[in-house]
Amino acid sequence: MKIAVSYLSIKDNIKEELSKIDKLNIDYIHVDVMDGVFVTNKTMDYLEESSILKDTTHKKDIHLMVEDIKEYVDMYSNLNPEYITIHYEASKDILGDINYIKNKGIKVGLSIKPNTSVDKIIPYLKNIDLVLVMSVEPGRGGQAFIESSKEKVEELYKLQHSYNYVIEVDGGINNETIKKIKEANISVVGSYITNGEYESKINSLKEGEK
């Protein structure tokens, strides 16, 4: 399983701490983008965030928790991410938004909140590269893993052979909960990493998924 580290939970010295995370044996930097509308919290503005992220050597995985999707896609596509993920619940034109991202040469993810069933996104699975299962309510870090997320991952895993997407899980991931999502391809970790010794925490995650 690949590891994406979200730096949303870093409170101080973000650039310095991100440079430490950048040296870890991980696969992605997960970038949470919040507009204060789709979710109540709001992240820093694009110019500030891009100045922090420009030096990272890891691939970027952008998670848009926003309503004005195209506006944010235009901004964050300049960071050359591997994925830009939008929310099923936020988009008013899902296929249009998917194609808008694809036309920029970027892989597309579609995310579902804890109360949204997998059935809702089945019509779009053939068009996307990633499904992001939110295992907490989106908008803030440090929440506990929602157990029903395990069933969603299992359902998406059974469907996966018919499509070309990877499964990503975000929220409440630690060395115990990672055992519940072994069918996932990418796990997003935040406060579990940033609240401790980075390298030992990554190692414990890799042990946990075995």
Model-derived features with residue positions:
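Glycine-enriched alpha-helix->loop->beta-strand junction motifs that scaffold or abut catalytic
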Residues: N25-D27, D55-T57, S77-I84, Y100-G109, ...
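Hydrophobic faces of well-ordered beta-strands that scaffold small-molecule active sites
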Residues: I3-S6, I29-V31, K60-L64, E82-I86, ...
